[in-house]
Amino acid sequence: MTAPPRPTAPPGAAALTGLAALHAWVDELAALLQPDGIVWCDGSRGQTDRLTKQLVAEGKLIRLNPEWRPNSFLSRTDPSDVARVEDRTFICSLDEADAGPTNNWREPEGMRAELREAFAGSMRGRTLYVVPFSMGPIGGPLSQLGVQLTDSAYVAVSMGIMTRVASAVLDLIAAGQPWVPTVHSVGAPLVDEAGVRQEDVAWPCNPVKYIVQFPETREIWSYGSGYGGNAILAKKCFALRIASVMARDEGWLAEHMLIVKVTSPEGRVFHFAAAFPSSCGKTNLAMLKPSIPGWTVETVCDDIAWLRPGPDGRLRAINPEAGFFGVAPGTGELTNKTAVEALWGNTIFTNVALRDDGDVWWEGLTAEPPAHLIDWEGNDWTPASGRPAAHPNSRFTVSAAQCPVIADEWDVVDGVPIDAILFGGRRATNVPLVAQARDWKHGVFIGATISSEQTAAAEGTVGELRRDPFAMLPFCGYNMADYWAHWLRMGEKLGADAPAIFQVNWFRKGDDGRFLWPGFSENARVIEWIARRVEGSAGAEETAIGRLPLADELDLDGLGLPAEDLAALFDIDTERWLAECALTEQYFARFGPRVPPALTAELASLRDKLRA
């Protein structure tokens, strides 16, 4: 679309607002970035089609066979630009202590000078795309606005899938609504300082990368990468790092969580939010197909949730995104048929393999690979090649509306009421299949101590733990201990209306090293018990680590689970748990006196209960 009309600010205005502020910001950045031209994005199908045709003509997208994947494309990144770069991700708070020990901190003014030098002229020879977007339904009470500047048409198109890009966003900005400014450049100008133009490449990027968040001013600057979360700034950068700071200041929660709508055979509806670190079954739970009759699970969101107390006092949540940016390998007919069905068309695939018939393939999509492929780097591939055909972090970008089990409420403006919150890691030892927290404080302690075992456990010990509190380790925009305190305050505010909190672990292993629980669709049996606990129809046994299902409370009909495996799934080894308490104490020590006293009290209480 053309740029919106420029209102004039009153003479002597101390600060511009509305569209005047937006235009002034775009003008200021354009002077720094020096693009050849500026295009304002409106999210329309016509503009998106023009951009994808342009990307195909430039060799940056490959159009897939429309018979197999209508309106779908494949992109191949530079081999150096395939994932988030956590070591080049910075939280530039005014006070280093506010970033905390889990974030990379840099002094803000020094970083600003560094960024201005990197961004100066970075868009010479390229087009600057202005992308106004809404996180959450446009105009909703839980939604937020942003504007991204980018020199990547691939990013502009991806933003149109992952967020709500529309001219209506500009109407809200014109009316005075605040917005988050985000700036992105691949850092590969096509014209040098002498005016000499060079040829473009299929995936421009720069060896030097910056992904920088300024919490106090709600700004995001990203340089050097065209990949996913580094470049689609609405995702992790805004929806979690900046939004978590906004949530702290404004009394809500921005979380790395899925939300599912669960309906019982009696027709009762529940909404569960769940936080899982990577490789812990998050997407599979978000799109769960229950193995037990009468229960249905529908997707509200698969990755990020924003939660805020509603007018009725209950915690309500929205999906701030409009699309899925999922990991392709391992997504197949057997593991997640729902996700595969969502990818029928209108999808951008990145770094997967190309079949000879013009469709895509990745490891895990089918049991047997095709006889010949073009791999993610553009080379011939056969099953004898001895290397993956798709990159392990290859992705699909698709509208959430295409998910065959998307809940009708996935984009309601005031969100859905949350009945329970689940936390889970990948634990071979100690953590039972499911346990309910005694209360909100105990639940926050569980969330703060989420971990996955990185090494095999020696006999009688716990393996090395990778801590990922609330699954927010790479994404919390401020001091993690302050984040825990914010969760505790939220519990005080919610009071008796607070959701119940549970811990789940699909990955407990037996002494012989095999998984004790079948997982996948059978996880619905655990979800059923959680739902029954929420409605008050299932019993529980009080233990040192939380409330466990009473005998025969879990529906195991037809599962064929040996009694000894069931016992092992809920076994509480006192010595191993005391050893884990020592590891938790060491972990809390990283945060010094900022750890909330309520959490150190929970740790002490856990030790007392184990020794009782």
Curated annotation (Swiss-Prot):
GO MF annotations, alphabetized: GTP binding; manganese ion binding; phosphoenolpyruvate carboxykinase (GTP) activity
Sorted UniProt keywords: Cytoplasm, Decarboxylase, Gluconeogenesis, GTP-binding, Lyase, Manganese, Metal-binding, Nucleotide-binding
The reaction(s) this protein catalyses: oxaloacetate + GTP = phosphoenolpyruvate + GDP + CO2
Binding site for substrate: R84, Y227, G228, G229, S278, N393, S394, R395
Binding site for Mn(2+): K236, H256, D303
InterPro entries: PEP_carboxykin_GTP_CS (IPR018091), PEP_carboxykinase_C (IPR013035), PEP_carboxykinase_GTP (IPR008209), PEP_carboxykinase_GTP_C (IPR035077), PEP_carboxykinase_GTP_N (IPR035078), PEP_carboxykinase_N (IPR008210)
Binding-site residues, GTP: S279, C280, G281, K282, T283, N284, R395, R426, F520, S521, E522, N523
Annotated cofactor note: Binds 1 Mn(2+) ion per subunit.
Catalytic site: C280
Similarity comment: Belongs to the phosphoenolpyruvate carboxykinase [GTP] family.
Protein name: Phosphoenolpyruvate carboxykinase [GTP]
Protein source organism: Leifsonia xyli subsp. xyli (strain CTCB07)
